[in-house]
Amino acid sequence: MTANFDGARFRQVLGHLPTGVVIVTGLDAQAQPVGVTIGSFVSVSLDPPFVGFFIGKSRSWPDISEGTLFCANVLSDAQTELCWRFGKDPADGATNRFDGLEWQKSANGSPILSGILASIDCTVESVTQVGDHRFVLGRVTSLNTTDVKNNAMVFYKGKVGGVAIHGE
């Protein structure tokens, strides 16, 4: 970090920009489900269909990336507990994140969590180091929406909540 740069101020200012929240899931080398909460998921390209996200020092990401397939589970505003469950590092005493959860396999075999708004299956196209994070570019192979009527979850000023669209 640059000598006069205030990282805390940077986070505080950028916290004013709401971001969507997804849980990226996959299978580890033993075909066990793994996942991590992501607050930087973005659409990158329509043709070809690419999405992307930034990942920090997650202990779950190496297990997911080993298989080169993942599913982005778009969270609803009713899934706060799920967001924090997958946001906590497993080394911090967290139990298996999938214990007691309902999920099914996506088209690529990755977990689709119950109650989400949408799922986006991808293959890892590239992983690029960018500063203190890695940018994961995923090629979309299938995508679906669900019948869940909740609003999307957003991360805003250090908290998660829902977003309401005016005029709906």
Summary of predicted features, one role per range:
Residues 1-168:
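Basic, polyanion-binding surface patches
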